[in-house]
């Protein structure tokens, strides 16, 4: 892992396929060691700053537990816990934190923020989520896919992403396919397709590794033969409620439900979601949406699919911690 030491983790295309694979291998080993009580602490004495301009359950807990398991200490800086971008520039914040911490995680808005932190901090910077990319999520996703199709190469797997494909998840899936050769199908209305330049770049790379990237509006053709169907919330973090009706009308036909799962003709197809999910009305926001838009059976995914044996979403959630631990170990462990 020496070639990853001190390296930033900002987006997946910053890595070679071999480096990406090495992170997955390390994550699997760390997961096994933790479960077998054999984990060895290699980050003892390290200090890690966690900058969250957007709140999160999984990302924060994953970084904190991973750090604690490895003997590191963390400082959580929440949405109101720092002056970044308000009273102090990102450049200055980077140079201050870089003098105090061994690594910095950023979860927030524009990709340019995490890129600036990386440019000036002088220590490894990790992207916990930006508007453009969500690389740690895809690392966990592919680890989960490996676990459920053991012995199968990524270029033998078919992953369908149904919904709004122009967001950070769609972009990072394109990059993951570019590195691994997945058969990636983005199933979405054309208004929700990613930028053509990124699609072209990732398609060319995916083909080199035995894969392909397809964009389609056709549900039946898009899901046929799929090994995994993935979706995400239709309303992104921080979006105005006024956009809800427009987005729901646009994406209602791409809901992951029993019919879509059956159209794969694969009885072993699995369901993926990065969470949180609007699959029922058991949350305040879920109740509001169910009432306003008649979505009592779920929004982007039905409760039937979410709670089915095909759903492996909590394996994904757990693997966030193991893969994030691998990233910190590889970039901080000497």
UniProtKB/Swiss-Prot annotation:
Keywords: Amino-acid biosynthesis, Arginine biosynthesis, Cytoplasm, Metal-binding, Transferase, Zinc. Signal peptide: none annotated. Pathway: Amino-acid biosynthesis; L-arginine biosynthesis; L-arginine from L-ornithine and carbamoyl phosphate: step 1/3. Carbamoyl phosphate binds at residues 56-59, 83, 107, 134-137, 274-275, 320. It holds the Pfam family OTCace. GO terms for cellular component: cytoplasm. GO terms for biological process: arginine biosynthetic process via ornithine; citrulline biosynthetic process; DNA damage response; L-arginine biosynthetic process. Belongs to the aspartate/ornithine carbamoyltransferase superfamily. OTCase family. This is Ornithine carbamoyltransferase subunit F.
């Amino acid at each position: 892992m020496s070639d990853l030491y001190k390296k930033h983790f900002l987006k997946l295309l910053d890595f070679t396929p071999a480096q990406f694979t090495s992170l997955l291998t390390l994550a699997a080993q760390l997961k096994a060691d933790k479960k077998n009580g054999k984990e060895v602490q290699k980050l003892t004495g390290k200090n890690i700053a966690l900058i969250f301009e957007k709140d999160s359950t999984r990302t924060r807990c994953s970084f904190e537990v991973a750090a604690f398991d490895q003997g590191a200490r963390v400082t959580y800086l929440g949405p109101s816990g720092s002056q970044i971008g308000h009273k102090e520039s990102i450049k200055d914040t980077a140079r201050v934190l870089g003098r105090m911490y061994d690594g910095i995680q950023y979860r927030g808005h524009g990709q340019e923020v995490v890129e600036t932190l990386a440019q000036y901090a002088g220590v490894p910077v990790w992207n916990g989520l930006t508007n453009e990319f969500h690389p740690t999520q895809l690392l966990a996703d592919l680890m989960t896919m490996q676990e459920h199709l053991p012995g199968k190469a990524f270029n033998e797997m078919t992953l369908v992403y149904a919904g709004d494909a122009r967001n950070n998840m769609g972009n990072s899936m394109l990059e993951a396919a570019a590195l691994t050769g997945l058969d990636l199908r983005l199933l979405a209305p054309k208004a929700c397709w990613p930028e053509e330049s990124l699609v072209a770049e990732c398609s060319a790379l995916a083909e080199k590794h035995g894969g392909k990237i397809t964009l389609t509006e056709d549900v039946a053709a898009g899901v046929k033969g799929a090994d995994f169907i993935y979706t995400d919330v239709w309303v992104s973090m921080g979006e105005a409620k006024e956009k809800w009706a427009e987005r729901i009308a646009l994406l209602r036909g791409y809901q992951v439900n029993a019919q879509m799962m059956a159209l794969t003709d694969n009885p072993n197809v699995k369901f993926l979601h990065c969470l949180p999910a609007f699959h029922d009305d058991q949350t305040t926001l879920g109740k509001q949406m169910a009432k306003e838009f008649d979505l009592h059976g779920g929004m982007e995914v039905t409760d039937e699919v979410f709670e089915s044996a095909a759903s492996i979403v909590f394996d994904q959630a757990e693997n966030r911690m193991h893969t994030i631990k691998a990233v910190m170990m590889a970039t901080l462990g000497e």
